[in-house]
Amino acid sequence: MTRRSRIHRTLLTILAFSFAVFSQGAQAAEREKLLSDLGVYGTFAAFKVDMDWWKLEKGAREAATASVKEVVQKHADHVIVDTYLLRGLSEHADLLLRIHATELIHNQQFLVDFMRTGLGVHLVNTSTFNGLTKKANYVPSFPDDTKASLKTPTDAGAKPYAIVIPIRKDPAWWLMDQETRVRQMKEHTDAAIPYLKTIQRKLYHSNGLDDFDFITYFETANLADFNSLILALQQVKENQHNRRFGNPTLVGTVHPLDDILDVFAR
């Protein structure tokens, strides 16, 4: 190989590496934007693996899980998919998918294809929740010191546990005047503020999209703090208007897709 050829090959390698890094960075930025934007649809789909799956040969399970990666790649331009292992921590499901898109139909199209994969045909869909991210209803009416406290950043570091709790309010809540609701949500918020550093939360509005009114999503590395948070929230007046809290409550651990598929391919 001539010196010019070696230089040319080196330049191509550098360009390819730079493009890959740029592409990964762009994908990460797009992901963060979609997860933080308002007007984004979130779908939580929980599944149990049927008994026939474990009767397959290991090679067949590996081939079946490989088809899942193809579906995720196919829909990558329209949806962001997060994966969670519930097996061993929840009787409700073995696997949870959290899907985000700017249109709910994109979540549906992904799930339809996912359930046609070699793994998907062995999954029983035990729960599906749909919600929409919206601006805060009550925070604009809170005192400035409360607003400032709500900006407390969550501690850095991995948060391996994920909890999903759907909530349905009673009719009295929706008939309540705005001032009273703001006051009760202020009490709710004050109870939650001490845990902002260790628990990351995301709220989805589900009215008309699901049987629930809200889907609450949490990530944490400190389950003791999470337990204390829920106990604190159960002691405020607003809790009296929760007709349904959980049922199901989904508890799992956060894992990349490859790790999840490896668990089911073993």
Label each region the model flagged.
Residues 2-12:
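Bacterial N-terminal signal peptides that target proteins for export
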Residues 12-22:
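Bacterial N-terminal signal peptides
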Residues 22-28:
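Sec/Tat signal peptide C-region and signal peptidase I cleavage site
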Residues 28-76, 104-107, 128-194, 207-211, ...:
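Short S/T/G/P-rich N-terminal loop/turn motif that feeds into the first structured element of a domain
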Residues 31-32, 81-87, 114-116, 151-153, ...:
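Catalytic micro-motifs at enzyme active sites that drive phosphoryl/nucleotidyl and oxygen chemistry
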Residues 64-66, 78-96, 197-202, 212, ...:
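A cross-kingdom feature marking solvent-exposed beta-strand/loop segments within repeated
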Residues 114-122, 234-242:
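A common structural junction motif
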